[in-house]
Every structure is written in C-alpha cells, then in structure tokens.
C-alpha cells in the first residue's frame, strides 16, 4: 500500500517480468526476464502479472479495458496481456519492489491443466500479445 500511495499514477505489482528487446523489437515472451527482482522503481518495460499482489488504479486505465467482447475474442487466456498493453498504450508505468519473493507457490499435482502450458510453452502469450497490439494499433 505504501508503494501505491507514493506512486498514484502507476500500477503497483509485486511480481513482474522484464520485457526484452532485440533491435527495438519486442522479444518472444519466453525470452523475457521472468519473476524479475533486480529492480526497484517504475518502468515502461515491466510486465505485471495479474496475480501475486497487483494494484491497478481504475481511474488511470482506459475504459476500453472493459470491452469484454474484444477481450474474449483476442486474448481470453491472458488477462495480464490485455491489461498490460492497454496500460502501455496509455503510457502508464509499472512499479515494483525487490524485497518479496517473486516465485509463485503451487501445490503438487494440482496444476495438471494450467495456463503456462498454453501461454508460455506453446507460444499462446506471443499470439495474444500480437493480437492486442494489432487491436490497439500499437507499434
């Protein structure tokens, strides 16, 4: 909460990934720095995960985030992609800290069906990122 009070125009997230680029082009999701914890501050290159403690001030986000038909059509399995690129389009920065563990905890044998299979291992996040960027007319 302290981080949010000190940065009211930012999205505050405990768990983030750092997006990486090659020659100015966004690298595939698998090539990003995941569960990034070497940064304390805000950046436009931090990609918040929508779990693990994320505060998104509704007043700073575009109303288009509520366009459920488009969301369901182009990135139904990646709400974090939808929210992150909507925020990036509006130039909203993400702030994080470096003093909490960024790795999620899962209970053995409860994650047989999981989004990581579809979104990370099979490249679903990259497809959904491209679809959202195309929809938002994002470079």
Regions found by a protein language model. Give the residues of each.
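C-terminal catalytic/acceptor-binding lobe
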Residues: 59, 63, 68-139
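Conserved catalytic core of nucleotide-sugar-dependent glycosyltransferases
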Residues: 1-69
């Amino acid at each position: 909460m302290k981080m949010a009070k000190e940065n009211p125009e930012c999205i505050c997230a405990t768990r983030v990934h750092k997006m990486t680029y090659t020659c100015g082009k966004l690298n595939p999701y698998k090539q990003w720095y995941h569960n990034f914890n070497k940064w304390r501050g805000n950046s436009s290159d931090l990609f918040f995960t929508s779990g693990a403690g994320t505060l998104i001030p509704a007043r700073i986000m575009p109303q288009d985030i509520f366009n459920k038909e488009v969301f369901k059509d182009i990135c139904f399995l990646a709400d974090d992609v939808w929210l992150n690129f909507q925020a990036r389009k509006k130039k909203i920065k993400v702030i994080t800290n470096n003093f909490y563990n960024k790795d999620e905890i899962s209970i053995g044998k409860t994650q047989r069906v999981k989004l990581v299979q579809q979104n990370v291992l099979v490249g679903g996040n990259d497809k959904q990122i491209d679809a959202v960027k195309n929809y938002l007319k994002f470079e």
